[in-house]
């Protein structure tokens, strides 16, 4: 299944999902795939409703004078490109985890219990809670995370990208060392270490906040995570 149209909401949403993690329709450089797709639009896409399509459309427009010289097959229809199979629909967001209830270590499945047994169990439970409270809070669990932040292309300003990443502040988050790693085609990605308090910082929320910098960031991945 490829692109369908760029007029209906369904068609534009399909394209927006496809371009959420891509700078170009095919590969890592502009080609005739971008040209035929660009020409299939009758108007500029709405940047508020379809931000990824709008960003791609604006970027490809800057190559308009080079359209005839870009590589690829100019005879293909735009419907030959786009998502395939499982890519055609957006992945549903993970449901929030249900709050864990404190396990009752002395519970019983029986509904008809001897009152004396119930009283004894409740007494044991209270003693358990008192001992647990007397021990005080446990040290905060922390993790060392290596995060990879991928830019759109080789023209992305990596210094600005890193500055925007480090500008994010959260209680329980400490940024560490970083470096730029080559991925090919002249493109480099940011690899940055950070320490998080597990109960305070969600890596999913942190990644989502980083990816809000749509001018610089294509996507993020957790490359490694280690409990401290």
UniProtKB/Swiss-Prot annotation:
One of its GO terms (molecular function) is guanyl-nucleotide exchange factor activity. Gene3D superfamilies: 1.20.1050.130, 3.30.70.60. One of its GO terms (cellular component) is cytosol. Keywords: Allergen, Elongation factor, IgE-binding protein, Protein biosynthesis. The keyword Nucleotide-binding does not apply. It holds the Pfam family EF-1_beta_acid. Residues 97-115 have a biased composition (Acidic residues). Residues 74-116 are annotated as: Disordered. Residues 84-93 are annotated as: IgE-binding. Belongs to the EF-1-beta/EF-1-delta family. EF-1-beta and EF-1-delta stimulate the exchange of GDP bound to EF-1-alpha to GTP. PANTHER family: EF-HAND AND COILED-COIL DOMAIN-CONTAINING FAMILY MEMBER, ELONGATION FACTOR 1-BETA. EF-1 is composed of 4 subunits: alpha, beta, delta, and gamma. This is Elongation factor 1-beta. It comes from Penicillium citrinum.
């Amino acid at each position: 299944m490829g692109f369908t149209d760029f007029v209906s909401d369904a068609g534009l949403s399909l394209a927006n999902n496809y371009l959420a993690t891509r700078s170009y329709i095919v590969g890592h450089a502009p080609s005739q795939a971008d040209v035929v797709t660009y020409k299939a639009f009758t108007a500029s896409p709405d940047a508020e409703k379809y931000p990824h399509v709008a960003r791609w459309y604006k970027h490809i427009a800057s190559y308009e004078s080079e359209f005839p010289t870009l590589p690829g097959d100019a005879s293909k229809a735009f419907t030959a490109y786009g998502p395939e199979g499982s890519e055609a629909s957006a992945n549903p967001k993970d449901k929030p985890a249900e709050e864990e209830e404190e396990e009752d270590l002395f519970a019983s499945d029986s509904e008809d219990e001897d009152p004396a047994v119930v009283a004894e169990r409740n007494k044991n439970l209270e003693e358990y809670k008192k001992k647990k409270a007397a021990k005080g809070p446990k040290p905060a669990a922390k993790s060392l995370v290596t995060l990879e932040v991928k830019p759109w292309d080789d023209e992305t300003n990596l210094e600005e990208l890193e500055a925007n990443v480090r500008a994010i502040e959260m209680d329980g988050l400490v940024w560490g060392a970083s470096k730029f790693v080559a991925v090919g085609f002249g493109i480099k990605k940011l690899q940055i270490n950070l320490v998080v308090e597990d109960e305070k910082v969600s890596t999913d929320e942190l990644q989502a906040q980083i990816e809000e910098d749509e001018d610089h960031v294509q996507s993020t991945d957790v490359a490694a995570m280690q409990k401290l």
